[in-house]
Amino acid sequence: MKDYLVKALAFDGEVRAYSVRTTNTVSEAQRRHDTWRTASAALGRSLTAGTMMGAMLKGDQKLTIKVEGNGPIGPILVDAHANGDVRGYVTNPHVDFEGTEQGKLRVYQAVGTEGFVTVIKDIGMREPFIGQSPIVSGELGEDFTYYFAVSEQTPSSVGVGVLVNGDDSILAAGGFILQIMPGAQEETISFIEERLQKIPPVSTLIEQGLSPEELLYAVLGEDKVKVLETMDVQFNCTCSRERIESVLISLGKTELEQVREEEEETEVHCHFCNERYKFSKEDITNLIENL
């Protein structure tokens, strides 16, 4: 099954809902970054939340999420675009902890329970929108829920999950975001709160083969949900050799000549996708000649 996202309304417009399958997306991130189990879960949950938050934007708008906890994983960075493209990385991918007796990965130990979630939105204005909230649990779903309440004043519920196999490969990943619209009835809010208490973990529902639509039906009830739009989502980095060449050219002739003198081979590393671009002395000379 391919990865895709669903935008929906529920309860006659009282609730805005997003749901996504990100199994392939998180698998690609795990493959590129060689993340261990707990690191995969942390990165995967962040990529999943970022994908849905990106889908709230329009056109060529994009956002960056930075999760900076006090755990050994270090900062997590995610870039997400309105078109469904997402990329991201963890600073230390080789972090893993023994799971609980129920097999649940201890993501909070990797992320840490103190720190901040920062969201930077590039929505075409002169200055980007920057929102920040403290980490409340380190499990990430709760942390993004709190972010929406504090920074965007939108009562929300964020559920994100990643199931990781013993060989570090990704078995299932996905999630949902529910947002209560102004004027929603108390009965609606109470109904959703009760349903959220009863449903299994998100990753379990996805492992069972539930599509993004069926995930929303499981949470809200099929008769309550009106699907508005679906869109494909994927891990996709914006880096390229041409872009790296442009960055090198921007250094100027003097600095490029110094690079050519000091390095037999110049390597530029993209943290987001772990791609490495190599430039020989001859490559650098060609760049200098084009200045």
From Swiss-Prot:
Entry GO MF terms: protein folding chaperone; unfolded protein binding
Record GO biological process: protein refolding
Keyword Chaperone set for record: yes
Disulfide feature: 237-239, 270-273
NCBIfam families in the cross-refs: PRK00114.1
GO cellular component, one term: cytoplasm
Species this chain originates from: Bacillus anthracis
Subcellular location: Cytoplasm
Keywords, ordered alphabetically: Chaperone, Cytoplasm, Disulfide bond, Redox-active center, Zinc
Domain of life assignment: Bacteria
Family: Belongs to the HSP33 family.
Name of the protein described by the UniProt record: 33 kDa chaperonin
Gene name of the record: hslO
Gene3D superfamilies named in the record: Hsp33 domain (3.55.30.10), HSP33 redox switch-like (3.90.1280.10)
Record's function text: Redox regulated molecular chaperone. Protects both thermally unfolding and oxidatively damaged proteins from irreversible aggregation. Plays an important role in the bacterial defense system toward oxidative stress.
